């Protein structure tokens, strides 16, 4: 599984992402906010999204080798990205495994890690944790002074939030934006 900041080459997964969010909202019955493909594309184009992709023949790649954080980018990643852009997509047979994006409020003083979703067939493999970690790194990279939060109704994400050092706070303390 490769977890990376989403870019233009990942726009093609917007429909899959929306379908997975919709299916999960029906299954969980907890009011997961559905998103449109246009909204997902907007987040991807703005550099405010993280995507996980399953890449055949790379299943044995260690998580650290397969993940690329913004602050770890260096020239190795830049040259890899340039090659991928020149060749179109990195792998034509890669498969959507998960996604998350960030939102900012209060003059960029508050940043939410939102929309965390993992495709059914990749659940229970640690994909959500890798996405969550990359989303946090991206949030800190883009908004270094912001308070980062994660709103969730799911027990698994609550547990992850605790492990990442998030603390529970009332919604009224987060931001005054509508």
State where each predicted segment sits.
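A short beta-loop-alpha structural element at the N-terminal edge
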Residues: 1-16
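Intrinsically disordered, low-complexity terminal tails and inter-domain linkers enriched
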Residues: 56-93
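Conserved acetyl-CoA-binding loop-helix of GNAT-fold acetyltransferases
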Residues: 118, 124-139
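Conserved GNAT acetyl-CoA-binding A-motif
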Residues: 139-153
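Conserved active-site tyrosine of GNAT-family acetyltransferases
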Residues: 161-163
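Conserved catalytic-core motifs of GNAT/GCN5-like acyltransferases
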Residues: 151, 165-178
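A conserved beta-strand-loop-helix scaffold within acyl/acetyltransferase catalytic domains
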Residues: 18-57, 92-120
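Extended, composition-driven regions rather than compact fold-specific motifs
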Residues: 156-159, 178
